[in-house]
């Protein structure tokens, strides 16, 4: 708890370009959470280097992502928006927690198996211990809640196990986090393969709408979205492509899927797909305009980076010093 508010932690990797799915499924919902929670939103650039990165590209993407947080409406005065790499406590606590994590637990992590298969030429220790760093990210700020998707639930369970194990030995040091259960964001699927989630790492760029795509690109991708030969707009699992487009249109317009189906009753895909494109363009234009404005204000973004790193460091240091004292590290001489 900070100032009577529960603490919420979340973050995104500075790899690839954020998609419409990232925005509608997570980022858009983060904006309102500061009314209820003390929020820490990190650009988790340390996680990004488990895969080889071009240094200049990583640096640029990290800044763009932090700027996008603000452009999306996350107030940097109410929320702590920072680079993970600017707070050394993440790495320090990660090492300590790794000494309270069992190899068998990490071996069971399905994401490691998936990523190792994709990057067989670079199966590094960082990829294997990724969930421990994620646990440190969360426990460092004594987070009460963490918004997670199904693919990250296993990592949160590991975080809880590590926290409980540590607390059983040393007393109530860590808050044991819960999964955030609130408004469910739209789950947006690939435009080219609606059985897969829309992803910034999709090898087919036509499968994802990126937040910085121009209107012509957005419209082209929507018109080329994979559908079916039935020709009728119905919200059902048997038509995954159309169901996905209905979800996108509904999320962008604030309508329910049933209302969307009713609106386009009797109309074909040739009318529906451009309407989806227009809805997406309307949602993303204000975000794109604000991102462009903020990107030109280097001094402002720099000030946010500095102030928020200091705030994050303040709270992380409180936890880290407590942990260090509990496990027997010598006190610092000041």
Please report, for each region that a protein language model flagged, where it lies by residue.
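Conserved nucleotide- and phosphate/pyrophosphate-binding catalytic cores
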Residues: 22, 154, 160-334
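Short helix-capping/linker segments at secondary-structure and domain boundaries
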Residues: 38, 103-107, 140-147, 250-260, ...
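Short connector loops/turns at beta-strand edges and beta->alpha or beta->beta junctions
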Residues: 45-46, 135-139, 194, 251-254
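Short, histidine-centered active-site or binding-site loop motifs used for metal coordination
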Residues: 12-14, 45-47, 144-145, 202, ...
């Amino acid at each position: 708890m900070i100032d009577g508010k529960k603490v919420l932690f979340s973050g995104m990797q500075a790899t690839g370009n954020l998609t419409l799915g990232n925005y509608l499924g997570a980022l858009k919902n983060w904006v309102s959470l500061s009314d209820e929670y003390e929020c820490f939103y990190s650009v988790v650039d340390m996680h990004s280097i488990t895969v080889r990165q071009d240094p200049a590209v990583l640096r640029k993407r990290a800044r763009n992502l932090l700027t996008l947080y603000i452009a999306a409406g996350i107030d940097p005065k109410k929320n702590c928006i920072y680079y993970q790499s600017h707070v050394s406590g993440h790495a320090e606590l990660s090492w300590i927690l790794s000494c309270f994590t069992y190899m068998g637990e990490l071996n069971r992590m399905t994401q490691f198996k998936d990523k190792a298969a994709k990057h067989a030429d670079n199966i590094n220790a960082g990829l294997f211990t990724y969930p421990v760093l994620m646990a440190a990210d969360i426990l460092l700020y004594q987070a009460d809640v963490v918004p997670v998707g199904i693919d990250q639930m296993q990592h949160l369970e590991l975080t809880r196990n590590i926290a409980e194990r540590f607390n059983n030995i040393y007393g109530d040091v860590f808050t044991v986090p819960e999964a955030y259960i609130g408004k469910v964001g739209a789950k947006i699927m690939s435009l080219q393969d609606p059985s897969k989630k829309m992803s910034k790492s999709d090898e087919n760029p036509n499968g994802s709408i990126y937040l910085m795509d121009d209107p012509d690109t957005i419209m082209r991708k929507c018109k080329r979205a994979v559908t079916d030969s039935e020709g009728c707009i119905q919200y059902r699992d048997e038509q995954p492509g159309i169901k996905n487009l209905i979800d996108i249109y509904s999320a962008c317009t604030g309508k329910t899927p049933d209302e969307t189906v009713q609106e386009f009753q009797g109309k074909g895909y040739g009318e529906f797909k451009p309407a989806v494109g227009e809805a997406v363009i309307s949602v993303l234009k204000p975000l794109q305009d604000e991102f462009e404005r903020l990107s030109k204000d280097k001094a402002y973004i720099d000030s946010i980076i500095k102030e928020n790193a200091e705030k994050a460091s303040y709270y992380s240091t409180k936890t880290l010093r407590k942990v260090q004292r509990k496990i027997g590290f010598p006190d610092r001489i000041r």
